[in-house]
Amino acid sequence: MSNVRYISNLTRETYALILAGGRGSRLHELTDWRAKPALYFGGKFRIIDFPLSNCINSGVRRVGVVTQYKSHSLIRHVMRGWGHFKKELGESVEILPASQRFSENWYQGTADAVFQNIDIIRHELPKYVMVLSGDHVYRMDYAGILAAHAESGADMTVSCLEVPIAEAAGAFGVIEVDDNMRILGFEEKPQRPKPSPDNPEMCLASMGNYVFNTEFLFEQLKKDSQNATSDRDFGKDIIPSIIEKHNVFAYPFKSPFPNEQAYWRDVGTLDSFWQANMELLSPTPALNLYDAKWPIWTFQEQLPPAKFVFDDDDRRGMALDSIVSSGCIISGATVRRSVLFNEVRVCSYSVVEDSVVLPDVVVLRHCKIKNAIIDRGCIIPEGTVIGYNHDHDRAKGFRVSEKGVTLVTRDMLGLPVGYE
């Protein structure tokens, strides 16, 4: 669809609802005190910034963020970083916490989270409603799926991408389509996904991003709310119940720009979170955070620049192949192939390699850290060794992932918890 005016009309007629209430239990202690969408990513961002930036860059300027699990840091971040939109100009980013609007229950599932906000959506008078997952890192121009939805005459459109069968098993909804991308079958998180017809090692997976005609969405949500056996979930209940009698289409995920590789990461495990951050260190990463054509917006703290001090023979403050964010001080220490978030301090004679270090961490002298995720606010005692011997890491109370990434949190170090 090349008609810019047509696309701009579609985005103006759309209300986006970002589902950001999930914990992300496969991240273990990393989400003990924050929802997965509030988790840090890429040196200065949080995961929620990516779907929000996609909305703004796509021209979708009316957005609701649905929150539930341990949402304080998420709400605070959205208020600080996304509260500048003008309602009188048709722009808004609103926070929609679970508040028992229609029953005594909190949000029971993805469909129920939308159903409990029907009155808020109706007040916006949108022609289309986008329901978006708030816990993935990706770049997507939502104008494309909106145009495809309108052109096909669909009641619902599901954004999808090809995923290896081994990766999809038990993790993603799996779609079957005909030659016109009409959905013929949908199974939520099967243990044995059906392969794509042209590639037996891949399957077509739902991204958890949907476009609905507004009235059609309301009808299906009301019907589902009256079904006592429903799990109140789009993947488990809504989609399987409508594909036979209604027009439900799949939309292949693509980059916002021609001839560029599409980027999407689940970051739902410690290993995938670590790996996705490490990928950013490439000279030409698949996700280019420096691409001004598709900026990622976030809350910007007023912090001084990063500083590297000491140039002695036995201690030299330096960072190589790394992302080092504002407020960091590398004091006579060495950082290699690592992502350091705001206000991290690495003290003399310490070495940090192949690690993701979240904000406000202090690494004291003579520490050696590699292949690790260090959670926010940790103070690593002098002489601590992390990531070199997994048995020793476990004996200290740290968690070691399936692929050998060591997670360290404040609780594991005996420090007060409740940080976010």
From Swiss-Prot:
GO terms for molecular function: ATP binding; glucose-1-phosphate adenylyltransferase activity. Keywords: ATP-binding, Carbohydrate metabolism, Glycogen biosynthesis, Glycogen metabolism, Nucleotide-binding, Nucleotidyltransferase, Transferase. The keyword Glycosyltransferase does not apply. Alpha-D-glucose 1-phosphate binds at Y107, G173, E188, K189, S206. It catalyses: alpha-D-glucose 1-phosphate + ATP + H(+) = ADP-alpha-D-glucose + diphosphate. InterPro entries: ADP-Glc_PPase (IPR011831), ADP_Glu_pyroP_CS (IPR005836), GlgC_bac (IPR023049), GlmU/GlgC-like_hexapep (IPR056818), NTP_transferase_dom (IPR005835), Nucleotide-diphossugar_trans (IPR029044), Trimer_LpxA-like_sf (IPR011004). Pfam families: Hexapep_GlmU, NTP_transferase. Homotetramer. This is Glucose-1-phosphate adenylyltransferase. The lineage of its organism: Bacteria, Pseudomonadati, Pseudomonadota, Gammaproteobacteria, Alteromonadales.
